[in-house]
Regions:
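A hydrophobic C-terminal alpha-helical subdomain
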Residues: 1-6, 75-124
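Glycine-rich Rossmann NAD(P)(H)-binding loop
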Residues: 4-9, 37-47, 52, 56-57, ...
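Substrate-positioning beta->alpha
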Residues: 6-27
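Short aromatic/basic micro-patch
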Residues: 13, 46, 112
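Short, flexible loop/turn elements at secondary-structure junctions
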Residues: 15-18, 40-45, 117
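Glycine/proline-rich active-site loop of Rossmann-fold NAD(P)-dependent oxidoreductases
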Residues: 26-37
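Amphipathic terminal alpha-helices
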Residues: 55, 66, 70-72, 101-154
Length: 154
């Protein structure tokens, strides 16, 4: 119920299969050396953390965090270090804090990348994270944070 970003901040997230499809499409495009093409959700399909909260709650069949959420500093999270196992289950507290610091720093940037060039090349719009978050919840159900991190940080 606490993290570094605001619930109104947005995040630019795409599914890995969309990224793979875009990369395959780009292999057949005549791009100039050094030309940049962002594979991203873009402004239109990025989502607010408040939207993620509601979609996660629906997927988990529980109430959203909503008004109970508090935007806090990293120092506050460090002070909560001993509570992390109660929140996330068995985990390495130090590694969790490091991950929260890295992800939190990115999330607070509230960055969205322009995918206009990619879309103009014929790539369809990506799905919004909230459109497939239920699949993410289902495929990670029963996995601890360390088990998920083992896959994420290979």
């Amino acid at each position: 119920q606490k993290f570094l970003c605001s619930m109104e901040d947005r995040i630019d997230v795409i599914p890995v299969d969309y990224c793979a499809d875009a990369l395959l499409m780009l292999l057949n495009q005549p791009l100039a050396h050094g030309e940049v093409v962002h594979i991203s959700a873009g402004e239109e399909n990025s989502v607010k953390f408040a939207e993620i909260d509601r979609a996660m709650a629906q997927a988990l069949e529980q109430a959203p965090v909503g008004d109970k959420y508090a935007q806090v500093s990293y120092d506050t999270l460090v002070k909560m270090r001993r509570e992390l196992k109660g929140i996330f289950g068995p985990c390495n507290e130090r590694l969790m804090l490091k991950a929260m610091r890295l992800y939190g720093a990115f999330a607070t940037l509230n960055v969205r990348f322009s995918n206009d060039k990619l879309l103009s090349m014929g790539m369809p719009k990506p799905p919004r994270f909230t459109d497939y978050i239920d699949r993410c919840v289902e495929t990670t159900r029963g996995l601890s944070i360390p088990q998920q991190m083992a896959v994420d940080f290979k």
